[in-house]
Amino acid sequence: MSELTALTIAEARDKLKAKAITATELTDAYLSAIDAANDAINAYVAVTHDQARSMAKASDERIAKGEAGALEGIPLGVKDLFATKGVHTQACSHILDGFKPEYESTVTANLWADGAVMLGKLNMDEFAMGSSNETSYYGPVKNPWRAKGSNADLVPGGSSGGSAAAVAAHLCAGATATDTGGSIRQPAAFTGTVGIKPTYGRVSRWGTVAFASSLDQAGPIARDVRDAAILMKSMASLDLKDTTSVDLPVPDYEAALGRSVKGMKIGIPREYRVDGMPGEIEELWQKGIQYLKDAGAEIVDISLPHTKYALPAYYIVAPAEASSNLARYDGVRYGLRVPGKDIADMYEQTRAAGFGKEVKRRIMIGTYVLSAGYYDAYYLRAQKVRTLIKKDFEDVFAKGVDAILTPATPSAAFGLADEVLANDPVKMYLNDIFTVTVNMAGLPGIAVPGGLNGQGLPLGLQLIGRPFEEETLFQAAHVIEQAAGRFTPAKWW
């Protein structure tokens, strides 16, 4: 069975097409793998055995009739942020206890329309707030990777930790994820997988539980660049139900793979050389530069002067939008309800019991920066900084730079229940230092494995592109992947 779960999406697609395997066999192999591993890894919060089998059966029937879709019979995991009709959708929060939506998100509807099979819902940081998948009501996810000679559990990154861990542990062929400040790219880097955050507006947000509406964007996490390109093609679409959705044709991203990067201009931002950056990250970055150089790309030094303000500005804008978005959870119509002596007390009791510590922290920060006395001092200034960050990128791209290469994270995966990080939220927030600028500017960014560190843990590189030029990112990421190789964790679970 494990040889079936070892297939990439591209390989499984070809075997299904050739009728060498059936969608039912493939789905059963994944369900068996999940049943055997999920107690150890905790990647899934709900497994849809019956639905998966009936979707696989329907796929086999369509394949037999010659009516196969682009993802026919491919078993996928869905981050618990996407509405799935009649299936557990709780953003891994206690406050949404028992919530099963009456509708399907646009992203998942697109995937099912192309023939994909749903294996279940994936664990994540509560309401997508976190960088380690430790804020989930359903407990932390364990990274399938471990340091050489160690049994210590590591975090998979966040907030899409369940998506990244499930892909790395071969508990799904690919997964949906979301990225508000790095929640696709950071977990991908921590697990040796590939994750792309598309341009803001490229993929519909409809039916995705909102965290920070002007920053949220859905994308795939997959085992390699080709699989990420295949998934992205199905996920992206114009959607009139999302006012930020852009009416641009969706290219065949897979076709960009294998194109030469000869003459492509790759920018290296000097501001990303942050104080205290570990030597292994600097080394990885140099390796990435060399890979692209060897393939014929032109490397240029660039400046993004407002980078140092990105993290503080992000941690004002995102909580402000979150405090507004999360005001709707009150226990009245759905989810958890804790009785109170009157309606105001019921709201208070429900929200106090329903939200976790990190979500409460961000709601409080957001409410504070939006309050009348502080709005100008914090929120307005953060939005001005955001405009300057966007302009930095526009200036660089105007000079002919095609893509920007940076590290994806400031370190490899760290330990589960790290006391220093648990007691200092700002240290935890620093995990997003290389990724937040991309969300602030609405640009596309991809994380691709660049190598392993001295402890045998994966390290990721990030490529940032011009708006709606994801093809360039797939093209350059594929070159890095070909040079660096692919990485799979040694099985301990």
Swiss-Prot record:
Q: Which Gene3D superfamilies match?
A: Amidase signature (AS) domain (3.90.1300.10)
Q: Which residues form the active site?
A: K79 (charge relay system), S159 (charge relay system), S183 (acyl-ester intermediate)
Molecular function per GO: ATP binding; glutaminyl-tRNA synthase (glutamine-hydrolyzing) activity
Assembly notes: Heterotrimer of A, B and C subunits.
The family classification in the record reads: Belongs to the amidase family. GatA subfamily.
Q: Which UniProt keywords apply?
A: ATP-binding, Ligase, Nucleotide-binding, Protein biosynthesis
What PANTHER family does its record include?
GLUTAMYL-TRNA(GLN) AMIDOTRANSFERASE SUBUNIT A, TRANSAMIDASE
Reactions catalysed, semicolon-separated, are: L-glutamyl-tRNA(Gln) + L-glutamine + ATP + H2O = L-glutaminyl-tRNA(Gln) + L-glutamate + ADP + phosphate + H(+)
The protein's organism comes out as Brucella suis biovar 1 (strain 1330)
Give the EC number(s) under which this enzyme is classified. Answer: 6.3.5.7
Gene label: gatA
Which domain of life, per UniProt?
A: Bacteria
GO BP annotations listed: translation
This chain's function reads: Allows the formation of correctly charged Gln-tRNA(Gln) through the transamidation of misacylated Glu-tRNA(Gln) in organisms which lack glutaminyl-tRNA synthetase. The reaction takes place in the presence of glutamine and ATP through an activated gamma-phospho-Glu-tRNA(Gln).
**What HAMAP family does the annotation carry?**
GatA
- A Pfam entry, by short name: Amidase
Any Gene Ontology CC annotation:
glutamyl-tRNA(Gln) amidotransferase complex
Protein name (database record): Glutamyl-tRNA(Gln) amidotransferase subunit A
Query: What NCBIfam families would the database entry show?
Result: gatA (TIGR00132)
